[in-house]
């Protein structure tokens, strides 16, 4: 299978549309379809912070329902799911923008979005193993010895990265650079931590180029191993592009 794997969108629907068109997709009935049968894949964090989270969610739901996309959840997806479950989550760190959009919708739309997003999340794999094990898509990455496993430890790593429990002065978590130690044969494609350019290291690539923070929205074309990006229309926030610890 041939894939176009898209980094963290975070509600940047305009850039998502531009990127899919640049990749050769044609929008039909509100979803991007590739004339050559390429399939989209998403590293998670569809919503929060950006201006059009519901449109991004709607599009991905439609694509997955039509078996035209692969979706794995990110930590923001996990939090939105818990919000929809009625759990006591803090409506902060970007979730407030998605909740505000959702609350402005009519009751029928609210029910549909909530129900369909919860189904999307519940049916999604924690991480995706594709192309006979040659490709792994995991939101914040995955250790080689975790591939094929599924437990709370693996879930925490896949959603949040290799966090130490410590915090930076701005409140963001300290993360170890797990990719430095990866020695596996599978290509791991991930996002979560914004980088200015796609970051290749030891058969891994981080394609979260910080669209919602004014960077770019990036896709990896697989198996071609080419990255394609479009510039963000959001204000640039330099401090969000932090090197790994």
Curated annotation (Swiss-Prot):
This is Bis(5'-nucleosyl)-tetraphosphatase PrpE [asymmetrical]. Asymmetrically hydrolyzes Ap4p to yield AMP and ATP. GO terms for cellular component: cytoplasm. Its EC number is 3.6.1.17. It comes from Anoxybacillus flavithermus (strain DSM 21510 / WK1). PANTHER family: BIS(5'-NUCLEOSYL)-TETRAPHOSPHATASE PRPE [ASYMMETRICAL], METALLOPHOSPHOESTERASE. It holds the Pfam family Metallophos. The keyword Zinc-finger does not apply.
């Amino acid at each position: 299978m041939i894939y176009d794997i898209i980094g963290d969108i975070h509600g940047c629907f305009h850039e998502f549309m531009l990127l899919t068109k640049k990749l050769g997709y044609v929008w039909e009935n509100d979803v991007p379809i590739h004339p050559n049968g390429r399939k989209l894949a998403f590293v998670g964090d569809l919503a929060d912070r950006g201006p059009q989270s519901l449109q991004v969610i709607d599009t991905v739901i439609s694509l997955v329902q039509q078996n035209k996309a692969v979706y794995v959840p990110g930590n923001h997806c996990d939090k939105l799911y818990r919000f929809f479950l009625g759990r006591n989550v803090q409506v902060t760190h970007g979730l407030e923008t998605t909740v505000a959009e959702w609350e402005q919708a009519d009751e029928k739309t609210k029910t549909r979005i909530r129900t369909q997003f919860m189904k999307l999340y519940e049916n999604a794999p924690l991480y995706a193993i594709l192309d006979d094990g040659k490709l792994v898509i995991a939101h914040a990455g995955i250790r080689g010895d975790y591939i094929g496993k599924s437990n709370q430890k693996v879930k925490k790593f896949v959603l949040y990265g290799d966090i130490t429990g410590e915090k930076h002065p701005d409140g963001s978590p300290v993360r170890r650079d797990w990719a430095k130690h990866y020695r596996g044969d599978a290509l791991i494609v991930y996002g979560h931590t914004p980088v200015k350019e796609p970051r290749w290291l030891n058969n891994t690539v981080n394609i979260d180029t910080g669209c919602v923070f004014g960077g770019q929205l990036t896709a990896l074309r697989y198996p071609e191993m080419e990255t394609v990006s479009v510039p963000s229309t959001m204000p640039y926030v330099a401090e969000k592009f932090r090197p790994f610890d």
